[in-house]
């Protein structure tokens, strides 16, 4: 059973949509940033400060390699995961890529008070626009994209469900029986 992989810029709702989608599909939910935090024993912000973005991206790439195998998960990725073509190939090998997008102002309103975003230093509004410009086209690898600024959470999830059904990604009897996140294999770097 293929993973449903949510990609998109920070603040587009990947975690919220992923959690709700996982509940509806009765599948385990995995947030890659949370998993990296769990494995590193510290928040993403501290990883960036203490170890650097390169270390974070390395951990992210390792996790993407583990996700190359279909496990029936709903996965919310970090916003920069698509910057590494190997990550995209691994995620695509194990699942279907669903993009979430939003207008820069919508993103700003969602993230402006969050201090945990290591890439948003200084003028947050300007930094969002700068990062979106740098990543222009990077999220186009998604098979289907929903603008979460234009739709409510339930509507966004509904649109994704329709797409998954139309494309045959939802198989009869494909619901998860474990209820938890399957153990990801320990692979060497």
From Swiss-Prot:
Binds 1 Mg(2+) ion per subunit. Monomer. Its EC number is 2.7.1.71. This is Shikimate kinase. One of its GO terms (molecular function) is magnesium ion binding. Pathway: Metabolic intermediate biosynthesis; chorismate biosynthesis; chorismate from D-erythrose 4-phosphate and phosphoenolpyruvate: step 5/7. Belongs to the shikimate kinase family. Its cofactor is Mg(2+). ATP binds at residues 11-16, 117. Keywords: Amino-acid biosynthesis, Aromatic amino acid biosynthesis, ATP-binding, Cytoplasm, Kinase, Magnesium, Metal-binding, Nucleotide-binding, Transferase.
């Amino acid at each position: 059973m293929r993973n449903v992989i949510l990609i998109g810029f920070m603040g587009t709702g990947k975690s919220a949509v992923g959690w709700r989608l996982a509940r509806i599909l009765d599948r385990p939910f995995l947030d890659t940033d949370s998993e990296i935090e769990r494995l590193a024993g510290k928040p993403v912000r501290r990883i960036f400060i203490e170890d650097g973005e390169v270390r974070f991206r390395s951990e992210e790439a390792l996790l993407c390699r583990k996700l190359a195998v279909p496990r029936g998960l709903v996965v919310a990725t970090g916003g920069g995961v698509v910057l590494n073509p190997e990550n995209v190939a691994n995620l695509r090998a194990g699942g279907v890529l669903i993009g979430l997008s939003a207008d820069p102002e919508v993103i700003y309103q969602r993230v402006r008070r969050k201090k945990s975003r290591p890439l948003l230093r200084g003028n947050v509004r300007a930094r969002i626009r700068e990062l979106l410009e740098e990543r222009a086209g990077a999220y186009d690898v998604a098979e289907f994209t929903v603008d979460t600024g234009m739709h409510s959470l339930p509507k966004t999830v509904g649109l994704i469900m329709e797409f998954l059904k139309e494309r045959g990604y939802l198989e009869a009897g494909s619901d998860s029986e474990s209820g938890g996140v399957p153990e990801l294999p320990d692979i060497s770097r």
